[in-house]
UniProtKB/Swiss-Prot annotation:
<feature type="lipid moiety-binding region" description="S-diacylglycerol cysteine">
    <location>
        <position position="27"/>
    </location>
</feature>
<keyword id="KW-0029">Amino-acid transport</keyword>
<dbReference type="InterPro" id="IPR018313">
    <property type="entry name" value="SBP_3_CS"/>
</dbReference>
<dbReference type="GO" id="GO:0005576">
    <property type="term" value="C:extracellular region"/>
</dbReference>
<keyword id="KW-0449">Lipoprotein</keyword>
<dbReference type="GO" id="GO:0006865">
    <property type="term" value="P:amino acid transport"/>
</dbReference>
<keyword id="KW-0813">Transport</keyword>
<dbReference type="GO" id="GO:0005886">
    <property type="term" value="C:plasma membrane"/>
</dbReference>
<feature type="lipid moiety-binding region" description="N-palmitoyl cysteine">
    <location>
        <position position="27"/>
    </location>
</feature>
<comment type="similarity">
    <text>Belongs to the bacterial solute-binding protein 3 family.</text>
</comment>
<dbReference type="GO" id="GO:0030288">
    <property type="term" value="C:outer membrane-bounded periplasmic space"/>
</dbReference>
<feature type="signal peptide">
    <location>
        <begin position="1"/>
        <end position="26"/>
    </location>
</feature>
<dbReference type="InterPro" id="IPR051455">
    <property type="entry name" value="Bact_solute-bind_prot3"/>
</dbReference>
<comment type="function">
    <text>Involved in glutamine-transport system. Interacts with the glutamine-transport system GlnPQ.</text>
</comment>
<keyword id="KW-0472">Membrane</keyword>
<keyword id="KW-0732">Signal</keyword>
<dbReference type="GO" id="GO:0015276">
    <property type="term" value="F:ligand-gated monoatomic ion channel activity"/>
</dbReference>
Length: 262
């Protein structure tokens, strides 16, 4: 990837990061805005308040993040620290709630494990490139969109694949388990083989080992992979919209608002 392109990505992420902390005040949950009993609303408010009080009493915010996605959440092998856009948002929330961005514990999640970890109480929130979908809203309450991505393909620089339409029967596309990417690619390219891995780091390693013709996920994540290895390129084409939101446990619909109003 050209250096100029990389800088454009970082500038864009930096600008969004400045806006995200305040933008979260509009936590989206369509079902909570209409036809609610006063008692139900009171219960949701209480649940959100109790969650916030629990975090303050504990003295740290526990957030589920990705460890394998350059630009968003990647563990630095030299320092052992996790770095990226999602990490900066998590630290911003910790500072807003507890007055110190360092009062935070980052737990590794994958697309497959993040919702179960949230719902069993291991983490307070998910900030891990999670697309807001109607299906996920049944299990998770979401903040407003903090980043809009689109699904694309990562291929070798000399690959003849320049569009999703170039994916033919017999080809193999790699992705991660539990992701919307796996669902989407099966819809737009039903004849290809889809191999799902535990995380995107494993999928990228498999691509470099020749186990597939392309890797698919959101373009923002693919840019990070291409930045790591210049032998690969991201297609300009996208074939979905992937709005990222912060996830919190169900029945704490006012939790996100509480976080930003602290």
């Amino acid at each position: 990837m050209k250096r100029k392109t990389v800088w454009k990505i970082w500038i864009t992420l930096a600008l969004i990061a400045l806006l995200s902390i305040t933008a979260l005040a509009g936590c989206s949950s369509e079902s909570s805005t209409t036809n609610k009993e006063d008692g139900a609303k009171s219960t949701e408010t209480s649940a959100g308040t109790n969650t916030l009080e629990k975090i303050k009493k504990r003295g740290k915010l526990i957030v589920g993040v990705k460890y394998d996605l350059n630009l968003f959440g990647l563990k630095n092998p030299e320092t052992g620290k996790v770095e990226g856009f999602d990490i900066d948002i998590a630290k911003g929330l910790a500072k807003k709630i507890l007055g110190d961005e360092n009062k935070i514990e980052l737990k590794e999640v994958t697309s497959k494990t993040r919702i179960p970890m949230l719902n069993n109480g291991e983490i307070d929130a998910i900030i891990g490139t999670m697309t807001i979908t109607e299906e996920r809203k049944k299990e998770v309450d979401f903040s407003d969109v903090y980043f809009m991505a689109g699904q694309s393909l990562l291929v070798k620089k000399d690959s003849k694949i320049n569009s999703v339409k170039d994916l033919k029967k017999g080809m193999t596309v790699l992705t991660a388990k539990g992701s919307t990417s796996a669902q989407n690619i099966r819809k737009v390219a039903p004849e290809v083989n889809v191999l799902e891995f535990e995380n995107y780091a494993e999928a990228f390693t498999a691509l470099k080992a020749g186990q597939g013709d392309a890797l698919t996920t959101d373009n923002a994540l693919l840019w990070g992979m291409a930045k790591q290895d210049p032998n690969y390129r991201v297609l300009d084409e996208t074939f979905s919209k992937e709005p990222y939101g912060i996830g919190s446990a169900k029945e704490t619909k006012n939790y996100c608002k509480s976080l930003t109003n602290t």
